[in-house]
């Protein structure tokens, strides 16, 4: 970045913003880059501002019981805020004084007042000087207030971020990411631009008082008629605003429904294409869009009338002010024109400035209070450790994720004190200790010496991760003691990658040791992966490490933990995404050898790991089921397998699982008016808890204190759509919330009004920050294959589901054992955080405008209609003004003339009032014409928005995956949310405002030019200067806005990244470093935003200067060339002043239109995306046995018959090569093999070898070369949809969209209920569906959150059965499944797909044993394709991965009838040894 010219700029340069000229010049000539932006002044740096506010906030916390954030802000910014407010007031006062001078100038042209003619020129100079003074006062004042608002935002941004890093995990479990992002974006952005309006809360009343005093002097009591009309108008507009909000609230729900489906479609676009659901999804979304648009139109019409009321009220304000006075006393033209000028200013103050100011204060104070509440949230407490301690000891430890006894005691005591409860309520406190719920850990005891390995095992939800959190201090014990040295290293279950290089991720701020680094890289099997990158370990990874596979991310996370020199290493299921062989090697070389002298606690369920552990701790439902050595375990606990894996018997467990789902669903989904499931029923469910807990918690403390709320379904809100998308595979325990999410306008930290009154306390948690930390990085064999494309852009938009928020509190000790480097490479930051600049022009092209206008044929006619009505208005105005300016009303019989009055008086005679009748008639006509002009325009523009949405949706659904892989999911969703919202809401009204203002200015110039032709000569250069200046400014301003927008994304990305890795950050003590990173991101954004504000003010000031010159020319031309008659001078000067006040608004509107039209450009860019090849590339031939007709057309209602292709499922693959994008590197090369009908083929290979890619290639989701035939039919000879219909798919990431069970199973509505139930029976889904109210019509929301992952897999199986597919592709179907559910799926596969060809990609050994053939993929090529016997006899990857005992079990099964019953038992036993890769706290 360049050094800012502002630092050396002179006072004049700062006053006129001339220091911005270099960047304006460069932006006009070429595209601006980040390096062209100026460095921010030191006063604006996030470090300085946050330190200043933090100091005042700490002072506020220390000095008061009820600290107020606004007091801290006041001490930081009050005096500058007040100074600019006074400047603003003085600038506004000049507007009130100008009409006085105008009146004197008009009076000087009265034939009876020739004495003042000589001073008219001086009055004109004074009038012009007032305009100059106003310009010099207002622009610095507005810029100064914008600047203060920006500084306040930066300081509060930083304060909030620092607070997030200090929050206790218990608080994090009660908040959600979306609320936090909402707090930062929706609330804090109000300060940036709203602060300039804040002073009008006192300026506007003073302005009104001054103006009314001046109008009173002219018109006496009748002045209040105009004011009364304006107040009524303001109330009318407020009523319209309330009505508009009602429609918008109703519409928000419809938008939410559409965006939820759209988001699910985008996130699962690969599945949509695999299932051939493009048309079904398009129809569903368009139906929702249709309903939404009805409410959009209603809201737009109300807003249109609201806007029009302001434009057309001018006539009536003047008329109502003048008429009563004229009827009683008569009136002179001087008073009419002076009153018109006063009323222009008065109208703005009453109907715009004051209401806006009140709204600004309301919003700002609300935001400050939300932040204040947030900053007082409970903080993470650093535990006191003894560095000399060598062992790790835990004695009688019990802990709750909910508040412990101490916190609960204080809370209830405080509530009782606040409410002054009587003695009768005292037992409220004592009777509720039992309401704390089930402890997550109960009476845990163990002791491990230095250098020992403790293996922690247990079923899902047993408390394994909670145990590690306890040791780290993230979870506070309610009872017991924990003892260790405090020097901890931690590897999370879900790998966390920060933006930066691989090397930076591993070293993570610890001093660099080359030998140790190389040893760790080798032990974690990263050498081969790093060698593949051109930059080696210096390759920059984006947020979340999206360019890496799940296994690579897991190994980097493990390497980070191992590299740090610590006394205790906490490894939470670090091998989750590794293949069997890699896991085996890393466990031996890293955990057992490299870390042999270190104390290690490893969460695992692998039998091999337990055997090599010094001590074993098995947890069951939070309690210690066993603690000791492996030999003791075998002797004392022979039933340990069932506890380890979390089930006692297959049938019993599956029944309990289904019952618990039913009960939890009914309990949570009982809405108002529905009877909830009784709690006695709930007690019978699988979450084992004493009846005493269940009964007593009905009277929970907080339920007694606060009012009980009805349970509600937590649905996604529009806030979710801003960019963060979370993995949809979340368990029931975290997807449902009993605490209603806050809506916009509610307290952002909602009152905790409910403690769960059912036995399953842990089910209470919502999609909290804690939940995101433990689940959102659920990247499986890397979340979706599309995100692992090496060519995919780094995702800057937050990528987890935005729901809402509620968090934070005080300061953490700044002491850290690490030296933090303050120097941060700006290029790395840029590479990590910034997108490529959009490939659309900086300024909206004329082609975009033309394409937009011609999109709907009616729009052209509407624009022509607007022009015709405008010409009629101008003609009517000329007639009216001619009458006012050239008619003198003096009744000869009743004429009165006073030598004291220097003006002609209209006598109170009815025959003389015809001018007013004409005035009223013309005003009414113009009002009617104005409404008729705008309403069709708004209606038509919304119709255009409808067309654009339809075209874009169709284009995205038909785009090839190679194109979609280069786009971020958040970016696509922004087109459907942000850009469509702009097209619906902002663009139609902004275009209307711009056209309205433009016509007012042009009309005024036309009238002035007709009355005084010389003035027309002055308007020509002014219009030319305006057009050139606007074009000059727009080139730079739009580029600066792009840079600002690009700079905003990393702020939120960094926040989400930090929260995902918060436990890791704290374990490593890296909070100061991440605060520095956050400040750097803030400063990069500030640089662009501050420069944009400065250039905008430069432009506004130049526009005003041009029109000051124009007004000076108009004033002197009118004064020097006008002879007798005050009418002409009055009209000319009044209209010139009106031009001055209106033009700035028109200029801003023109810039807004250009800015909003960029959304249209982005939509057009999506509409113009290439489409998938839908037609066969070869001529279709007739095949034998009628397998394929000459013409096969795919329709929504195609139903496969038994004799239609494919019939057998034979596949022949020849020279298949696959790439993610055209011209990219080959992911698979020259793959050739064949599969017999009904055969089962297993895909083998290391993590990232291309197994999932091969399945995608079969479906033609990638750029492919070569040929594949199914039953003799080549993929080139039939349509794409036909080809994909041949396959049934069970993907890694299961796709459940918001809709009924029936819609999810059969979106095209082809099948009857009987057929669907039959298939549900086959796959074991009937018992699940039947337990939900409504059965097939039960609506699944939030990715099917009420279903387990296994039930979602069964849904996919049912879809495949319904599709009559002959070839089944399974991609890691057992990932994140407990063994029992996996057994159900295996059984369903055998029954429903007995005669189908099955291609299986799987890590579980026992699942692969049922395959007849195995395809081994290494280095993107086929290495082996043989039967299991041959692979085991040779030195193959499979042989290395499978243990000796497994091989001994296999051969009898394959070669001898003697052991026919063995495999089932052996397989089941192996099943029990598998790790369940999902930990719920």
Curated annotation (Swiss-Prot):
Ranges that cross the membrane: 78-98, 123-146, 196-216, 223-243, 299-319, 340-358, 859-879, 919-939, 991-1011, 1014-1034, 1096-1116, 1131-1151
Motif residue range(s): PDZ-binding: 1479-1481
Domain ABC transporter, chain residue ranges per copy: 423-646, 1211-1444
Enzyme Commission number(s): 5.6.1.6
Topological type in the membrane: Multi-pass membrane protein
Residue stretches of biased makeup (Acidic residues): 1471-1481
Pfam families with a match to the protein in the record: ABC_membrane (PF00664), ABC_tran (PF00005), CFTR_R (PF14396)
Gene3D superfamilies named in the record: ABC transporter type 1, transmembrane domain (1.20.1560.10), P-loop containing nucleotide triphosphate hydrolases (3.40.50.300)
Modified how: N-glycosylated. Phosphorylated; cAMP treatment promotes phosphorylation and activates the channel. Dephosphorylation decreases the ATPase activity (in vitro). Phosphorylation at PKA sites activates the channel. Phosphorylation at PKC sites enhances the response to phosphorylation by PKA. Phosphorylated by AMPK; this inhibits channel activity.
Family matches, as InterPro entries: AAA+_ATPase, ABC1_TM_dom, ABC1_TM_sf, ABC_transporter-like_ATP-bd, ABC_transporter-like_CS, ABC_transporter_C-like, CFTR/ABCC7, CFTR1_ATP-bd_dom1
Cytoplasmic compartment segments: 1-77, 147-195, 244-298, 359-858, 940-990, 1035-1095, 1152-1481
Region called Disordered R region, residue ranges: 654-831
Annotated ranges, domain ABC transmembrane type-1: 81-365, 859-1155
Annotated region (Disordered), positions in chain: 1453-1481
Modified residues (Phosphoserine): 549, 660, 670, 686, 700, 712, 737, 753, 768, 790, 795, 813, 1445, 1457
Residues bearing attached sugar chains per UniProt: 894, 900, 909
GO molecular function terms attached to this record: 14-3-3 protein binding; ABC-type transporter activity; ATP binding; ATP hydrolysis activity; bicarbonate transmembrane transporter activity; chloride channel activity; chloride channel inhibitor activity; chloride transmembrane transporter activity
Positions with a binding annotation for ATP 2: 1220, 1245-1252
Gene Ontology cellular-component annotations: apical plasma membrane; cell surface; chloride channel complex; cytosol; early endosome; early endosome membrane; endoplasmic reticulum membrane; membrane
Subcellular location: Apical cell membrane; Early endosome membrane; Cell membrane; Recycling endosome membrane
Stretches assigned to the Extracellular side: 99-122, 217-222, 320-339, 880-918, 1012-1013, 1117-1130
Family: Belongs to the ABC transporter superfamily. ABCC family. CFTR transporter (TC 3.A.1.202) subfamily.
Subunit structure: Monomer; does not require oligomerization for channel activity. May form oligomers in the membrane. Interacts with SLC26A3, SLC26A6 and NHERF1. Interacts with SHANK2. Interacts with MYO6. Interacts (via C-terminus) with GOPC (via PDZ domain); this promotes CFTR internalization and thereby decreases channel activity. Interacts with SLC4A7 through NHERF1. Found in a complex with MYO5B and RAB11A. Interacts with ANO1. Interacts with SLC26A8. Interacts with AHCYL1; the interaction increases CFTR activity. Interacts with CSE1L.
Its biological purpose: Epithelial ion channel that plays an important role in the regulation of epithelial ion and water transport and fluid homeostasis. Mediates the transport of chloride ions across the cell membrane. Possesses an intrinsic ATPase activity and utilizes ATP to gate its channel; the passive flow of anions through the channel is gated by cycles of ATP binding and hydrolysis by the ATP-binding domains. The ion channel is also permeable to HCO(3)(-); selectivity depends on the extracellular chloride concentration.
Name of this protein: Cystic fibrosis transmembrane conductance regulator
Protein source organism: Saimiri boliviensis boliviensis
Gene behind this protein: CFTR
């Amino acid at each position: 970045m360049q050094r800012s010219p502002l630092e050396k700029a002179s006072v004049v340069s700062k006053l006129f913003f001339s220091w911005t000229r270099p960047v304006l010049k460069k932006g006009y000539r070429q595209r601006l880059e980040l390096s062209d932006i100026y460095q921010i002044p030191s006063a604006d740096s996030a470090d300085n501002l946050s330190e200043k506010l933090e100091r005042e906030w700490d002072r506020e916390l220390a000095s008061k019981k009820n600290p107020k954030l606004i007091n801290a802000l006041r001490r930081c910014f009050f005096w500058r805020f007040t100074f600019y407010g006074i400047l603003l007031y003085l600038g506004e006062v000049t507007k009130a004084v100008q009409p006085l001078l105008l009146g004197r100038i008009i009076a000087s042209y009265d034939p009876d007042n020739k004495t003042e003619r000589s001073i008219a020129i001086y009055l004109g100079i004074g009038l012009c000087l007032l305009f100059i003074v106003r310009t010099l006062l207002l622009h610095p004042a507005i810029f100064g207030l914008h600047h203060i608002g920006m500084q306040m935002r930066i300081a509060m941004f930083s304060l909030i971020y620092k607070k997030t890093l200090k929050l206790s995990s218990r608080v994090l479990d009660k908040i959600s990411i979306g609320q936090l992002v909402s707090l930062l974006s929706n609330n804090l952005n109000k300060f940036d631009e709203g602060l300039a309006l804040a002073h009008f809360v006192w300026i506007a009343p003073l302005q009104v008082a001054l103006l009314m005093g001046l109008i009173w002097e002219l018109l006496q009591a009748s002045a209040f008629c105009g004011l009364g009309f304006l107040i009524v108008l303001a109330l009318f507009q407020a009523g319209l605003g309330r009505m508009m909000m009602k429609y918008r609230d109703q519409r928000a729900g419809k938008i939410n429904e559409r965006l939820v489906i759209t988001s699910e479609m985008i996130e699962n676009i690969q599945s949509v294409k695999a299932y051939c659901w493009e048309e079904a999804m398009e129809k569903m979304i368009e139906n929702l869009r249709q309903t939404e648009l009805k409410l959009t139109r209603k809201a737009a019409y109300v807003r249109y009338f609201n806007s029009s009321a302001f434009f057309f009220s001018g006539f009536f304000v003047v008329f109502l002010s003048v008429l009563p006075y004229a009827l009683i006393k008569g009136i002179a033209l001087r008073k009419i024109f002076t009153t018109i000028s006063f009323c222009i200013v008065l109208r703005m103050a009453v109907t715009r400035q004051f209401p806006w100011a009140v709204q600004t204060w309301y919003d700002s104070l609300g935001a400050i209070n939300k932040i204040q509440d947030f900053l007082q949230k409970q903080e993470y407490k650093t535990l006191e450790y003894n560095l000399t301690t060598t062992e790790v000891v835990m004695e009688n430890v019990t802990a709750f994720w909910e508040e412990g006894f101490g916190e609960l005691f204080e809370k209830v005591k405080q509530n009782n004190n606040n409410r002054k409860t009587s003695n009768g309520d005292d037992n409220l406190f004592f009777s509720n200790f039992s309401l704390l719920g089930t402890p997550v850990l109960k009476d845990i005891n163990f002791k491990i010496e230095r250098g020992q390995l403790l293996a922690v095992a247990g079923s899902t939800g047993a408390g394994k991760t909670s145990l590690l959190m306890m040791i780290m201090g993230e979870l506070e014990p309610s009872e017991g003691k924990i003892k260790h040295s405090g020097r901890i290293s931690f590897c999370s279950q879900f790998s966390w990658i920060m933006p930066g290089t691989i090397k930076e991720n591993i070293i993570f701020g610890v001093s660099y040791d080359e030998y140790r680094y190389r040893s760790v890289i080798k032990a974690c099997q990263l050498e081969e992966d790093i060698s593949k990158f051109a930059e080696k370990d210096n390759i920059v990874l984006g947020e979340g490490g999206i360019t890496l596979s799940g296994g690579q991310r897991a190994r980097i996370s493990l390497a980070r933990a191992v590299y740090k020199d610590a006394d205790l290493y906490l490894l939470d299921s670090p091998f989750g995404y590794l293949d069997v062989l890699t896991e085996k090697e890393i466990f031996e070389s890293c955990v057992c050898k490299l870390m042999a002298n270190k104390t290690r606690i490893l969460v695992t369920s692998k039998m091999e790991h337990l055997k090599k552990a010094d001590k074993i701790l098995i947890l069951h439902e939070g309690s210690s089921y066993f603690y000791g050595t492996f030999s003791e375990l075998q002797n004392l606990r022979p039933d340990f397998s069932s506890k380890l894996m979390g089930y006692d018997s297959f049938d019993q467990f599956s029944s309990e699982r289904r019952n618990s789902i039913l009960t939890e669903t009914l309990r949570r989904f009982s809405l108002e008016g529905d009877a909830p499931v009784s709690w006695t029923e709930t007690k019978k469910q699988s979450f084992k808890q004493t009846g005493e807990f269940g009964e007593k918690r009905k009277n929970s403390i907080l339920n007694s204190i606060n009012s009980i709320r009805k349970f509600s379904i937590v649905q996604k809100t529009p806030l979710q759509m801003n960019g963060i998308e979370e993995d949809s595979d979340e368990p029931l325990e975290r997807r449902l919330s009993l605490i209603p999410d806050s809506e916009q306008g509610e307290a952002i930290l909602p009152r905790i009004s409910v403690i769960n009154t059912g036995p399953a306390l842990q089910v209470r948690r919502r999609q909290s920050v804690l939940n995101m930390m433990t689940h959102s990085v659920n990247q499986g064999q890397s979340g979706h294959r599309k995100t692992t494309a090496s060519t995919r852009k780094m995702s800057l938009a937050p990528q987890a589901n935005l729901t809402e928020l509620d968090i934070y509190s005080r300061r953490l000790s700044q002491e850290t054992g690490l030296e933090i480097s303050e120097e941060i490479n700006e290029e790395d930051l840029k590479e990590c955080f910034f997108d490529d600049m959009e490939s659309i022009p900086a300024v909206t092209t004329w082609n975009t405008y033309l394409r937009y206008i011609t999109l709907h044929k009616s729009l052209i006619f509407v624009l022509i209609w607007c022009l015709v009505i405008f010409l009629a208005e101008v003609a009517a105005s000329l007639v009216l003004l001619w009458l006012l300016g050239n008619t003198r009303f003096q009744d000869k019989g009743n004429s009165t003339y006073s030598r004291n009055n220097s003006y002609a008086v209209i006598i109170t005679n009815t025959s003389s009032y015809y001018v007013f009748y004409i005035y009223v008639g013309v005003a009414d006509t113009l009002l009617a014409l104005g409404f008729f002009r705008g309403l069709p325009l708004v209606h038509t523009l919304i119709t255009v928005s409808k067309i654009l949405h339809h075209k874009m949706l169709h284009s995205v659904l038909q785009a090839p995956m190679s194109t979609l892989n280069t786009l971020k999911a958040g970016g696509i969703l922004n087109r459907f949310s942000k850009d469509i919202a702009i097209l619906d809401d902002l663009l139609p009204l902004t275009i209307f405002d711009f056209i309205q203002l433009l016509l007012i200015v042009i009309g005024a110039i036309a009238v002035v030019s007709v009355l005084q032709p010389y003035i027309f000569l002055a308007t020509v250069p002014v219009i030319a200067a305006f057009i050139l200046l606007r074009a000059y400014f727009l080139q730079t301003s739009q580029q600066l806005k792009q840079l600002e927008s690009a700079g905003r994304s990393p702020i939120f990305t960094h926040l989400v990244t930090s929260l995902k890795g918060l436990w890791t950050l704290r374990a490593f003590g890296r909070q100061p470093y991440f605060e520095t990173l956050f400040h750097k991101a803030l400063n990069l954004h500030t640089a662009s935003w501050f420069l944009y504000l400065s250039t905008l003010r430069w432009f506004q000031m130049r526009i005003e200067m041009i029109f000051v010159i124009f007004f000076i020319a108009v004033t002197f031309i009118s004064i020097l060339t006008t002879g007798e008659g005050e009418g002409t001078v009055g009209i000319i000067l009044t209209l010139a002043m009106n031009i001055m006040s209106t033009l700035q608004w028109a200029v801003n509107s023109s810039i807004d239109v250009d800015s909003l039209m960029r959304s249209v450009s982005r939509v057009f860019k999506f509409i113009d995306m290439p489409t998938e090849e839908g037609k066969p590339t070869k001529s279709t031939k007739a095949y034998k046995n009628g397998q394929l007709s000459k013409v096969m057309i795919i329709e929504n209602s195609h139903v496969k018959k038994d004799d239609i292709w494919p019939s057998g499922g034979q596949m022949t693959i020849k020279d298949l090569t696959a790439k993610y994008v055209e011209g990219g590197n080959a992911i698979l090369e020259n793959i050739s093999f064949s599969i017999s009908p009904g055969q089962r083929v297993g895909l083998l290979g290391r993590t990232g070898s291309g197994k999932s890619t091969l399945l995608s290639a079969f479906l033609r989701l990638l750029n492919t070369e070569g040929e594949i035939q199914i039953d003799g039919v080549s993929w080139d000879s039939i349509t794409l949809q036909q080809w994909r219909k041949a396959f049934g798919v069970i993907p890694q990431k299961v796709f459940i969209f918001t809709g009924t069970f029936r819609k999810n199973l059969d979106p095209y509505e082809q099948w009857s209920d009987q057929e669907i139930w039959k298939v549900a029976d086959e796959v074991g889904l009937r018992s699940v569906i039947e337990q939900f109210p409504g059965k097939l019509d039960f609506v699944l929301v939030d990715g099917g959150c009420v279903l387990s992952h296994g039930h979602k897999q069964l849904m996919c199986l049912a879809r495949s059965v319904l599709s009559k597919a002959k070839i089944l592709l399974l991609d890691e179907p057992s990932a994140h499944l407990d063994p029992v559910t996996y057994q159900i799926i295996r059984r369903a596969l055998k029954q429903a797909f007995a005669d189908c060809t099955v291609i299986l990609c799987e890590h579980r050994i026992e699942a692969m044993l049922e395959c007849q053939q195995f395809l081994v993929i290494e280095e993107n090529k086929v290495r082996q394709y043989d039967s299991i016997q041959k692979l085991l006899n040779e030195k193959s990857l499979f042989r290395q991965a499978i243990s000796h005992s497994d091989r001994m079990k296999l051969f009898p099964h394959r070669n001898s009838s003697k052991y026919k019953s063995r495999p089932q038992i052996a397989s089941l036993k192996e099943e029990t040894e598998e790790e369940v890769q999902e930990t719920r706290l």
